[in-house]
Regions:
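The feature marks the mature, well-folded catalytic cores of soluble enzymes
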Residues: 1-297
Length: 297
């Protein structure tokens, strides 16, 4: 299975929005934020089915009577290191999420991985993006501690480009950074200092996007083979609304990037997960990065 793009997802049987633990959730009133569970399962299953048609997808089991409302956002559960069979479990700053990493670590332990919980605050693959070899890009400052990356460098020989996150709407790195290939990275360039941008440029080419395009979820994408998967609710927005204008601009930019690289964009409606502050990349954890090795043309 090592040559097959492999991912992990979770059926959202415990998904809820009772605890508002990010700024995006504050935009909903008490009635609109309630999760339609059957619809959430259908939305997740659409993404699962597509990924499974292109590779392999593990399903992280949800324990009976599980109360972890955000378990479905597996990109925060931890990260699989690519040069050695080790799974680093998260150390959540969001207190209602503590315990998710235990379920993930047990699962990867059953697969034969060595599992270790980060001794410092760290919220998983959503904060630490793999590029190639031992090179990663890590976000810190809101949900993750910079010391977590220093520990990983010392313990596992990683080379981590560390970027400070300051915008509460971009509280995880995947809100501003998307490794498009192992040599290029989509970046919301206004999110970072000139020095931070230069540190990225030392290891990869930068494909720039705007902050508005980041806020509407452009970098919350997943690549599998020659497809880019992204969440979009544009079909349900009024064409006269400001939200439609922002969403349309994001989609056009993503489609431009895809077209320039002989790729195709596939959109998924994930309205139920937007209630929890999540988009497509939040639902997916990479077990490997074979999609990075696939030739674009």
């Amino acid at each position: 299975m090592t040559n097959v793009p492999t991912f992990m997802m979770n059926i959202p049987s415990s998904y809820d929005t009772a605890v508002r633990n990010n700024v995006w959730m504050e935009e909903y009133d008490d009635e609109d934020i309630i999760v339609n569970k059957p619809k959430a399962i259908r939305e997740m299953w659409e993404v699962y089915s597509f990924l499974a048609s292109q590779g392999f997808v593990y399903l992280l089991p949800t324990p009976i009577d599980c109360k972890l409302q955000d378990l479905v956002f597996v990109a925060n559960n931890g990260i699989v290191l690519q040069h050695t069979p080790i799974y680093i479990g998260s150390n959540f700053k969001a207190t209602n999420r503590i315990g998710e990493e235990v379920i993930g670590m047990r699962f990867f332990d059953s697969l034969g991985y060595k599992t270790i919980r980060s001794p410092f605050e760290f919220e998983g693959e959503a904060e630490l993006k793999y590029l190639r070899d031992n090179i990663y890009i890590g976000g810190y400052g809101i949900r993750s501690d910079k010391r977590a990356y220093e520990w990983m460098e010392s313990e596992f020989g990683l080379n981590i480009i560390k970027l400070e996150l300051k915008d509460p709407k971009n509280y995880h790195l995947d809100c501003t950074i998307f490794p498009f290939t192992n040599e290029s990275v989509i970046v919301a360039v206004d999110s970072f200092t000139k020095e931070e941008i230069k540190s990225i440029e030392k290891v990869a080419d930068i494909i720039p996007i705007t902050m508005d395009q980041a806020h509407t979820g452009l970098t919350n994408s997943v690549r599998v083979n020659n497809y880019l998967l992204n969440a979009s609710d544009i079909d349900f927005l009024s064409k006269r609304s400001e939200d439609y204008r922002y969403e349309s601009d994001k989609n056009r930019r993503l489609e431009q990037i895809a077209a320039d690289n002989a790729m195709e964009v596939c959109y998924f409606n994930l309205e139920e997960y937007m209630k929890g502050g999540g988009l497509l990349s939040c639902l997916v954890l990479h077990v490997n990065y074979e999609r990075m090795l696939t030739k674009l043309i």
